[in-house]
Every structure is written in structure tokens, then in C-alpha cells.
A protein has these predicted regions:
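Carboxylate-rich, polar loop motifs that coordinate divalent cations or form catalytic acidic clusters
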Residues: 1-175
Length: 175
């Protein structure tokens, strides 16, 4: 529970996503930053809380194969954090030649069976191809959530439909 003026508590009671990382810590995406509960020591850390220049509302969390935490915000894209320190490693969107989406409103982040990271929201669906260390953008409708249907196939739950996306060809089929 959030306790005002207590830094050793949840940063905000409005929790949008919960993630248990590979070390057993619990991460919370909230309406006022990201909180991490270090279960073994019963200590709390909070990131991006009350920051006017950065995101505050976070909706999505995912851990990649390297142990980094990907966090999607409702106003300023997505962030990659060092799991051990909570330090921001990178913030997207930024000027990268292969990130073609504006991608500021992130609803979900998902790791598929190949370890690639899928990011989706109000704009496009973006896949970070981990082996190639580059982004690929798929044109799609505004989406809420997704999951891997089978290797190379993603189910996308969009605002007005459900889609099946073929990762290799980029073909999108309405279901």
C-alpha cells in the first residue's frame, strides 16, 4: 500500500501491471511511476515518481533475456531499466533510424519465445529483434494487448478487432 511520505512503500495505489523478475523482485507499473519491492529484504524503490519532465503513468512491464526491465508509459514512450540498479539505460522514442513509430502511448510489452520484445499501443506495433539489436515496426490498428499464438505468430487485440500477425512476412489477418 502507498504510504504518503514513506519512501519504503508502494509509490502509488493505482497499479496497472505487476511483474515478478527473474531474481524474485516484484515490479509495479503505477499511475505515479514504477515501484520495485525487493521481497528478500522487504525494501521498496520508486522510479519516475512526481517527475514533470518524464512519464508518470506506466501501463506495461516486461523483463528481457538479459534481465533488463522494459517499461511502457502513457505519454512518453518506453524505457529500458537495469534490473539491479533501476537506472535508465535508454528511453525510446528517440532518434533511431529503425524506430519508425512515434510510439508514445504504450499499452503492452511482451517477450516472445525467441526473446524478441513486442511493444504496442495507440500507434504501431513495434518488435525489438534482440539478436539483430534493431526495431521492426508493423502497421496495425491501435492495440490493447497481444500474445504469441505460435512461434512467429502474434495475436493482437485491437480497439475494433482481433488480428493475427505473421512476424516473418508482416502479413496481418483479421479474425
Amino acid at each position: 500500500t502507498h504510504q504518503v511520505n514513506n519512501p519504503n512503500s508502494l509509490g502509488n495505489d493505482n497499479v496497472n501491471k505487476i511483474l515478478e523478475d527473474s531474481k524474485g523482485d516484484i515490479w509495479f507499473a503505477t499511475n505515479n511511476g514504477i515501484s520495485r519491492w525487493r521481497v528478500a529484504t522487504n525494501e521498496w524503490d520508486t522510479y519516475y515518481q512526481n517527475k514533470q519532465e518524464q512519464a508518470q503513468v506506466f501501463l506495461a512491464l516486461c523483463e528481457d533475456d538479459e534481465g533488463n526491465i522494459w517499461a511502457g508509459s502513457f505519454s512518453s514512450g518506453f524505457y529500458v531499466l537495469d534490473r539491479n540498479t533501476g537506472k535508465e539505460l535508454v528511453h525510446y522514442p528517440r532518434n533511431t533510424s529503425d524506430l519508425k513509430s512515434d510510439g508514445k502511448f504504450i499499452m503492452n510489452i511482451y517477450k516472445d519465445s525467441e526473446g524478441d520484445i513486442w511493444i504496442g499501443g495507440i500507434q504501431d506495433v513495434i518488435c525489438y529483434l534482440t539478436k539483430e539489436k534493431r526495431f521492426h515496426t508493423y502497421g496495425a490498428q491501435p492495440m490493447r494487448t497481444f500474445m504469441e499464438f505460435s512461434p512467429g505468430k502474434m495475436l493482437l487485440a485491437c480497439t475494433y478487432s482481433v488480428l493475427l500477425l505473421d512476424k516473418e512476412t508482416g502479413k496481418i489477418t483479421f479474425l
